[in-house]
From Swiss-Prot:
Any matching Pfam family: Mito_morph_reg
Name of protein: Transmembrane protein 11, mitochondrial
Compartment(s): Mitochondrion inner membrane
Membrane topology category: Multi-pass membrane protein
Keyword Isomerase: no
Family to which the UniProt record says this protein belongs: Belongs to the TMEM11 family.
Sorted UniProt keywords: Membrane, Mitochondrion, Mitochondrion inner membrane, Transmembrane, Transmembrane helix
InterPro entries cross-referenced by the UniProt entry: TMEM11
Lineage of source species: Eukaryota, Metazoa, Chordata, Craniata, Vertebrata
Organism of this sequence: Homo sapiens (Human)
Length: 192
């Protein structure tokens, strides 16, 4: 695998620097290097990224621009679905408190359906993807702790593993509450 550019960084490796405050162990950081060896280099980059995601490294640095951009976009879409589910569900639940009851269902029902749709789409497409456990790191201080000076790419994408259990619980709970509200409101509107 070393021929494909696979390198683990840890204490004592050539990737460390004296200015780092915290040394990273071999299980903390994985770098997908942009080394083209043959026709299927892109497939090899994707394979390495999959292996790194499944191995649950704390940091994954992606040098190949195309795969890094695709991964960052995929994570951004997942974040957008999560935030939309939470915000639309919150709007669904709190609109009846802010608007007159005669008009609140015009906003709360579509918001509830949107929340449920986003939560369902997230659950189907992102929940079991190992990428959903990662976020793109933009914080300069945290990035300075990583051995980025050893890279050949000037714009790598850095992923950091974060626990998403609370986030999933939040949007599932809000979407479920929005569903209950919508069913109750539809029953009241059409059964009476």
């Amino acid at each position: 695998m070393a021929a494909w550019g696979r390198r683990r960084l840890g204490p004592g490796s050539s990737g460390g620097s004296a200015r780092e405050r915290v040394s990273l162990s071999a299980t903390d950081c994985y770098i997908v290097h942009e080394i083209y060896n043959g026709e299927n280099a892109q497939d090899q980059f994707e394979y390495e990224l999959e292996q790194a995601l499944e191995a649950q490294y704390k940091y994954i640095v992606i040098e190949p621009t195309r795969i890094g951009d695709e991964t960052a976009r995929w994570i951004t879409v997942g974040n957008c679905l999560h935030k939309t589910a939470v915000l639309a569900g919150t709007a669904c639940l709190f609109t009846p408190l802010a608007l007159p009851l005669d008009y609140s269902h015009y906003i709360s029902l579509p918001a509830g359906v949107l929340s449920l749709a986003c939560c369902t789409l997230y659950g189907i497409s992102w929940q079991f993807d190992p990428c959903c456990k990662y976020q793109v790191e933009y914080d300069a201080y945290k990035l300075s702790r990583l051995p980025l000076h050893t890279l050949t790419s000037s714009t790598p994408v850095v992923l950091v593993r974060k626990d998403d259990l609370h986030r999933k619980r939040l949007h599932n709970t809000i979407a479920l509450a929005a569903l209950v509200y919508c069913v109750k409101k539809i029953y009241e509107l059409y059964a009476v």
